[in-house]
Amino acid sequence: MLIVSDTTPIITLMKMGHLDILKHLYGKVLIPNAVYMELTGNEKFVAEVSQVIGSDFLKVEEVDNEVAVTILQEVSGLDAGESEAIVMANSRKADLLVMDEHKGRGVAKKMGL
């Protein structure tokens, strides 16, 4: 099963101390570079960053189409993490996109995700 996640669901689980739920449910979860940067570069989550860096199931990968990411950001107003997650899920035919933002879910749904 191929799973792609955006930033906020991971942050929520990290803050609760239950990031491992994703591992138990899905085994491996792909996150695009922008999501990784949002997770590890935010000063609010310094205490939780080790959960991401030390994770054996969160796999950071590059998106295949940066042009699509840029266009999606410009057209939809989504941020880099949301846009990269949607483009990655679409291009890799993911079974599930984990995203909590209403606007992002709406865009993903219109794209058939």
Q: Where in the sequence are the language-model features?
A:
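Active-site-proximal, substrate-binding regions of enzyme catalytic domains
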Residues: 1-95, 102, 111-113
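Active-site-adjacent loops and short helices of periplasmic peptidoglycan-processing enzymes
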Residues: 105
